[in-house]
């Protein structure tokens, strides 16, 4: 092949390749244009399918149907829903079942339906049980013979969402729904006459009978006459509460109903102002053998109606046997081994706390009632026939509750001034804190060892310059005003001390006791007159290793300094000054040192600060009380009874369960077994110390000087408040009980 032929062939190949390349580029360009058109078309289609922005947001359904719930699809509130209609499942469209909480596992699914579904289920279930049980009177009689005249509902057959749309439309919330019974609440059967031993003696016989229809079927009110879980009883419209759960809506409605009666409404106002209960704000509900009406003649039985809001009366004493019915022996036997509760009464007589042996729930097993004769009569009464029981119940008195009047709630009004203006008229001279600190110094030097005295002196010396700096510019009028502020604060604390129910003490900044509560005297044996300096202090318990000292009193040879008003240029005559007990005399050595070290930090430190720690209070013991002292462990004998409540301690016998008694008639209580004032006196009887935890803070006056020290604490099984120159701390501190 010649060179010319080769060159021509290459030229032809290049031309063909160029044409192919041009064709390829054109093809690529066409494909890209088609792709762009396709994407644009898809975007337009997507934009066309987009939701209209003006379209309102679809409301979320309260509960999806079963099919939509399994498919995780959007459902509606209507039944059948639109999706089930499109798919042809409209006949099987019903609410789905949600996962129940653990406390609802025993409740059927029908009772958890939203709105009125649960009431409709209860009504349908009650009607079905009435029809099925028309020929079974034996089962009904078995339920009636219960001593409490109610039984838990028998296990019914739940057909599970078998109601149709017609049933939902035909059923309304009317009076017939008041008889609906929740499956988790007790059933009160009223289909047959009730035995009179389960009803109130004043209830007519017709109240225990239920009218029935002509065909023998029970009436629409044959179910519950008092069902706490029935929303119709409290006029609750659960459908309007927008709750998805029957029990949640009922709980919310019950809280609202309870809140309607907490206002300060006078007792004479109508009960309807507190929220009506039942169909006509009244009903019938009787306790076993009791009638809580005003009288059996002028009023009938009621259920929390208008008559239930009337004032309580004192017409007759409470009959314990009649109140607790035939189970009185069983109740008393079960409660005989429990520790007796106690309450300290410092209010009017109608608030007096009954003695431990007077409580019907705290009687011993050997004597269930007041005496053996009553117990024998009660046992013989159980064997009498029904007519005799009816006659006896008619003759028994009406059970009444104590009368509670608003005007009788004036605690401590006999000793309290009518107003605070008398304080400003009575205070004429300032209080000598200098004499108080001198007396405190003499007491500390006499009681404590040199090492402990040095620690206390260092703590007080650290705040002495601050006291001097804050008081050097005060004149006589300022000091008088300071004392008026102190007395005014005590006047304010009077109600707190009487109402708190815990041992309370109020002291000045020198540690001198200014006020004390009755509970503190009962617990420690320190009488109020002794603590305030109105009576001599004969205490010999200083917290030593032997518990009690047989030597001199805690005062020793110390003579209180007389208070002279010459230092204030008011008079030249010296007036004897009463010396109250110091706080240091009520604590053991370690507690006193710890207190003053903390007081030095808090006196001029944080005005809102507080200290929480433990301490040991010393019991009040005289030489007569310490007549018998154990040689080895320092236990106190039976003669250690306090002046407060000592007589009651000897009245305790040793026949109760779980307790032992000493040879001199005293009782040793176990941990947590405290009964009345006598039981409180037993605290710390071994070593003369009561261990407790306490919290205290400092209250300052208008000159920013510590005025009061407030201590709140708690003894074994008993709260204690020790207020020493400060604002009371209302927080309750649990006891740190140690063996």
From Swiss-Prot:
UniProt record, GO biological process: cellular response to starvation; gluconeogenesis
Binding region for DNA: 65-93
Matching CDD domains: GAL4
Location comes to: Nucleus
By its UniProt entry, which InterPro entries does this protein fall under? ERT1_acuK_gluconeogen_tf, PAS_13, Zn2-C6_fun-type_DNA-bd_sf, Zn2Cys6_DnaBD
**Which GO terms label this protein's molecular function in UniProt?**
DNA-binding transcription factor activity, RNA polymerase II-specific; RNA polymerase II transcription regulatory region sequence-specific DNA binding; zinc ion binding
Task: State where composition is biased (Polar residues).
Answer: 1-33, 267-284, 397-411, 562-574
Q: Which region ranges are annotated with the description Disordered?
A: 1-62, 174-223, 264-308, 380-420, 537-574, 639-668
Gene Ontology annotations for the cellular component aspect, listed alphabetically: nucleus
**Source superkingdom:** Eukaryota
Q: Which UniProt keywords apply?
A: Activator, DNA-binding, Gluconeogenesis, Metal-binding, Nucleus, Transcription, Transcription regulation, Zinc
Residue ranges annotated as compositionally biased, kind Basic and acidic residues, are 40-55
The Low complexity compositionally biased stretches are: 547-557, 653-664
Family from the record: Belongs to the ERT1/acuK family.
According to its UniProt entry, the function of this protein is described as: Transcription factor which regulates nonfermentable carbon utilization. Activator of gluconeogenetic genes.
Name used for this protein in its record: Transcription activator of gluconeogenesis MCYG_04674
Which species is the source of this protein? Arthroderma otae (strain ATCC MYA-4605 / CBS 113480) (Microsporum canis)
């Amino acid at each position: 092949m010649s060179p010319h032929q080769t060159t021509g062939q290459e030229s032809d190949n290049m031309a063909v390749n160029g044409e192919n390349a041009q064709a390829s580029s054109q093809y690529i360009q066409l494909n890209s244009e088609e792709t762009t058109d396709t994407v644009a078309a898809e975007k337009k289609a997507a934009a066309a399918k987009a939701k209209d922005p003006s379209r309102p947001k679809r409301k979320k359904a309260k509960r999806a149907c079963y099919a939509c719930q399994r498919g995780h699809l959007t459902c509606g509130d209507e039944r059948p829903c639109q999706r089930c209609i499109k798919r042809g499942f409209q006949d099987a469209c019903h609410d789905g079942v949600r996962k129940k909480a653990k406390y609802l596992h025993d409740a059927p699914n029908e009772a958890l339906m939203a709105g009125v579904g649960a009431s409709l289920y209860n009504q349908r279930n009650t009607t079905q049980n009435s029809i099925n049980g028309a020929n079974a009177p034996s089962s009904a009689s078995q339920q009636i013979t219960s001593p409490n005249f109610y039984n838990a509902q028998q296990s019914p057959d739940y057909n599970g969402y078998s109601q149709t749309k017609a049933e939902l439309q035909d059923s309304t919330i009317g009076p017939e729904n008041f008889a609906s019974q929740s499956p988790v609440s007790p059933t009160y059967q009223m289909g047959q006459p009730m035995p009179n031993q389960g009803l109130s003696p004043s209830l007519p016989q017709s109240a225990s009978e239920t009218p029935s229809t002509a065909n023998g079927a029970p009436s629409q009110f044959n179910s519950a006459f008092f069902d706490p879980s029935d929303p119709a009883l409290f006029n609750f419209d659960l459908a309007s509460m927008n709750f998805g759960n029957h029990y949640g809506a009922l709980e919310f409605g019950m809280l609202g109903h309870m809140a309607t009666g907490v206002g300060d409404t006078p007792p004479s106002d109508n009960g309807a102002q507190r929220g009506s209960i039942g169909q006509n704000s009244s009903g019938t509900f009787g306790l076993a053998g009791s009638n809580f009406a005003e009288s059996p003649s002028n009023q009938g039985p009621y259920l929390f109606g208008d008559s239930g809001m009337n004032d309580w009366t004192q017409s007759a004493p409470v009959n314990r046997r009649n109140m607790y019915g035939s189970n009185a022996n069983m109740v008393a036997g079960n409660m005989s081994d429990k520790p007796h509760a106690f309450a300290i009464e410092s209010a009017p007589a109608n608030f007096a706390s009954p003695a431990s042996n007077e409580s019907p729930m705290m009687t011993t097993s050997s004597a269930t009632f007041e005496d053996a004769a009553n117990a024998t009569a009660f046992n013989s009464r159980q064997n009498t026939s029904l007519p005799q029981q009816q006659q006896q119940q008619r003759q028994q008195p009406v059970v009444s509750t104590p009368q509670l009047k608003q005007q009788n709630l004036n605690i401590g009004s006999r000793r309290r001034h009518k107003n605070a203006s008398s304080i400003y008229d009575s205070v004429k001279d300032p209080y000598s804190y200098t004499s108080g600190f001198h007396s405190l110094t003499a007491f500390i030097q006499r009681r404590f060892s040199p090492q402990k005295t040095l620690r206390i002196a260092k703590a007080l010396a650290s705040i002495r310059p601050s006291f001097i700096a804050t008081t050097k510019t005060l004149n006589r009028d300022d000091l008088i005003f300071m004392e008026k502020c102190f007395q005014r604060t005590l006047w304010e604390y009077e109600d707190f001390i009487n109402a708190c129910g815990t041992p309370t003490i109020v002291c000045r900044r020198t540690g001198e006791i200014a006020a004390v509560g009755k509970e503190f005297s009962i617990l420690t044996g320190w009488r109020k007159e002794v603590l305030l300096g109105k009576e001599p202090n004969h205490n010999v318990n200083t917290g030593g290793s032997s518990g009690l000292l047989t030597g001199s009193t805690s005062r020793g040879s110390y003579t209180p300094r007389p208070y002279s008003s010459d230092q204030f240029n008011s008079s030249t005559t010296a007036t004897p000054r009463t010396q109250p007990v110091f706080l240091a005399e009520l604590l053991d050595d370690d507690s006193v040192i710890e207190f003053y070290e903390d007081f030095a930090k808090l006196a001029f430190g944080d005005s809102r600060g507080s200290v929480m720690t433990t301490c040991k209070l010393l019991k009040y013991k005289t030489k007569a009380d310490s007549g018998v002292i154990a040689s080895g462990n320092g236990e106190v004998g039976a003669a250690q009874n306090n002046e407060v409540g000592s007589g009651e301690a000897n009245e305790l016998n040793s026949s109760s369960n779980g307790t032992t008694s000493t040879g001199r008639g005293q009782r040793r209580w176990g941990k947590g077994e405290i009964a009345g004032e006598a039981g409180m006196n037993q605290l710390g009887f071994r070593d003369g110390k009561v261990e407790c935890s306490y919290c205290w803070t400092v209250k300052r006056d208008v000159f920013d000087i510590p005025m009061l020290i407030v201590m709140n604490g708690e003894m074994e099984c008993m709260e204690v408040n020790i207020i020493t120159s400060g604002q009371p701390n209302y927080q309750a501190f649990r006891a740190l009980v140690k063996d």
